[in-house]
Each structure stands twice: as structure tokens, then as C-alpha cells.
A protein has these predicted regions:
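Glycine-rich loops and low-complexity Gly/Arg-rich segments
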Residues: 31-34, 54-58, 87-91, 128-130
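Acidic (Asp/Glu)-rich catalytic clusters
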Residues: 18-26, 43-63, 93-97, 195-202
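Hydrophobic faces of well-ordered beta-strands that scaffold small-molecule active sites
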Residues: 2-8, 28-32, 62-66, 103-105, ...
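Active-site acidic/histidine proton-transfer and metal-coordination neighborhood
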Residues: 12, 74-209
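N-terminal substrate-binding region of glycoside hydrolase catalytic domains
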Residues: 24-45, 66-77
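Acidic-and-aromatic substrate-binding clefts and catalytic sites of carbohydrate-active enzymes
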Residues: 6-16, 34-47, 82, 110-113
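Membrane-targeting and insertion segments and their boundary/processing signals
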Residues: 4, 62-69, 161, 165-168
Length: 209
């Protein structure tokens, strides 16, 4: 069954309130997350309960989480990944206890998502996100990071937090030996580790390609 939902970036970051979302015909709930919790840390049950209560007070439901971000150690396959996987499992447990059973995530290295233009103008005057591989191939990662952040018009973008800039070069170094095959193997390792918890609570993991 399809449920109509809208992405909501939280009361601190979204200019569209829950009350306005509620007025959209057919919309039953929102897709949201806890933006201030860094990847790798456990989501406390109390924080999930507070977010759920805030959404439900407007007459909507949390229909999914996007995202519970995955720590780089899990993607790289570092020895300390076991602790971060354990934290992720605890987060899934807490979400399951509150009946939140759809979790989006990605397994992309370094950047959670990449666009080369956040406001590409179309012939009708509207703007869209755009990606050009030639731009990515020709630019220094740190310069690209700064350009993307500066074009965000003051909005905080998940996966592009300023604190990541300080370690972006270190991340590229950490990922240098991670081949496509190794990245996939690490994904399989992660999924096998969380599978029992997902089955216990009926959680559907939706990977962002």
C-alpha cells in the first residue's frame, strides 16, 4: 500500500511547518530524521519519542526515517566497525519500539550524495538539482565541498555538515583502498549484522542508490 508523505527537515531547519504539510490533500505523514545526531551514535529512545510526539501532535505520522546514517568505519570495513554496527542495531531497536519501520540509508563513500548544481535553471525559470561528472572529475574535493556548501543559501544539508570539511582529505585517504567489490562486501556484512533486528521489528531498510 502506498502512503503519501512529505520530507520534513525538522522544526529548526524546515521553513515548511507540520501544520502546512497537514493541509496538503492526501498527505498522511512525513519522512524525517534526527539531524543533530552524528553518524555512528545511538539514537536515544527518548529523542525518538519526542520527535514522534511532535509529529503526531499535528495529526500526522512518521512514515519513515531518512536517514540513519552509517559511520564511515562500517563502509570502509575498519576494525572498529563492530561498535558502530552495535550502535546502529540499538537505534533500530529504539525505532522499532516506537513502530517506525521504514529506514532509508545510503552506503556511498565520503559524500552521502553529490550534485554539481543545486539551482540549475530550466527554460521555464524553475530550478532543479543537477549532476555533471565532468565537473566532478576536474575539481579538487575540498574546493567542491566549499562550493556546494556556499551555494546552499544558508540551509544546512545532511551529509554536508561544515565539520566534515575538516576531515574530507582524511576520508579520501581512508577510502583509497576500498574497491567497488570491497565496498559491496562491507555492505553485505552490515546487512547480515542488522538483519535479525530488522526481522524482529518488521523494519524495512530502503537503500538510496
Amino acid at each position: 500500500m502506498i502512503h503519501m508523505s512529505l520530507r520534513w527537515f525538522g522544526s529548526k531547519h524546515d521553513t515548511v511547518s507540520l501544520e502546512k504539510i497537514k493541509q496538503i490533500p492526501g498527505v498522511e505523514g512525513v519522512i524525517t530524521t534526527l539531524y543533530d545526531i552524528p553518524a555512528g551514535q545511538t539514537w536515544p529512545l527518548q529523542r525518538i519519542q519526542a520527535l514522534k510526539a511532535e509529529v503526531e501532535a499535528s495529526g500526522l505520522k512518521i512514515l519513515g526515517i531518512e536517514s540513519v546514517n552509517i559511520h564511515d568505519s562500517i563502509k570502509i570495513g575498519s576494525p572498529d566497525r563492530e561498535q558502530y554496527i552495535a550502535n546502529y542495531i540499538e537505534t533500530l531497536e529504539n525505532l522499532g519500539k516506537e513502530g517506525i519501520t521504514t529506514v532509508c540509508y545510503n552506503f556511498m563513500p565520503v559524500f552521502d550524495w553529490t550534485r554539481t548544481d543545486l539551482f540549475k535553471k530550466r527554460p521555464d525559470g524553475s530550478t532543479v538539482l543537477a549532476y555533471d561528472q565532468k565537473v566532478v572529475d576536474a575539481i579538487d574535493p575540498e574546493v567542491f565541498f566549499n562550493q556546494t556548501n556556499s551555494s546552499a543559501q544558508g540551509f544546512e544539508m545532511p551529509g554536508w555538515e561544515p565539520e566534515r570539511l575538516a576531515k574530507v582529505k582524511d576520508l579520501f585517504e581512508a577510502y583509497k583502498d576500498v574497491t567497488e567489490e570491497k565496498l559491496f562486501d562491507n555492505l553485505v556484512y552490515f546487512l547480515k549484522a542488522i538483519q535479525p533486528t530488522c526481522e524482529k521489528w518488521g523494519i524495512k531498510m530502503a537503500i538510496h542508490p
